[in-house]
């Protein structure tokens, strides 16, 4: 059994580890610039499979060198890694894209985005069930402040949009968005679980390597023998290469390095930097963004989220020394 995260057990959260999770989440949003130049002739799945293939190629030497380390993963650890690869890396993106496309058809975009904001709540519940994480009472008001901050950023133009969208919402749009949120949230918790037995390098390598066969299969099923005929050399240099290196490889290495020393319930709050960063990137002029206006309330919301992330980073929380081969239980921090 893992040691208690009380005063005498566990590992102290690294300085700036929560902030580093937020930085990684911000890097995820940077793919918008490069992705915008690909979506005219490639589908989201085709973009994801090419990105995954490049990163797998980059990390193959790392995976080969760390084969001995993979023996530390018990069946629970392997199950966690497979769920991350198949769910968070593969199916979640497909579900979210499908939800967005359905929302576009019925003009209920806000339904997709507001239900996506359930992800941190799902992750906190899963961290409690899977890892046994317990947070102090002050944590919950901080969560509320962070979610209010993100809400102000995402729905600045019309704060009532989620209410009307949900009232006129479509069941299929909501289920797809919730499915993506569940898979991404489980990726955070199970990633923290697996990192108890393997390094962040190995975790990153396994995530992309195990996801690649599934993604290739999905693309072939969707588009048949011509699934890979739409790629051009100009797609790979610089766009797909940049997506693979920055929001892909660099962001995930940084994310798993920070997650290895951060409770999952704290990391999921820091991940909320992603929709905030994506919103501000969208405000950039073309071709970098969509020239969307910036509202004063968005600056307020951003300040609230940054304040919560800094607060979480300054706390004296401790992370239990977990192992993917053991029963996990975290005492109250």
Annotate each predicted stretch with a short phrase.
Residues 30-31, 67-110, 152, 244-262:
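Specific transmembrane alpha-helical segments of multi-pass solute transporters/efflux pumps
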Residues 25-26, 47-50, 109-118, 190-213, ...:
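Helix-helix packing/entry segments at the starts of transmembrane helices
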Residues 2, 16, 41-91, 120-127, ...:
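Transmembrane alpha-helices of multi-pass small-molecule transport proteins
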Residues 1-49, 98, 161-196, 279-281, ...:
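Glycine-/small-residue-enriched transmembrane alpha-helix faces in small-molecule transporters
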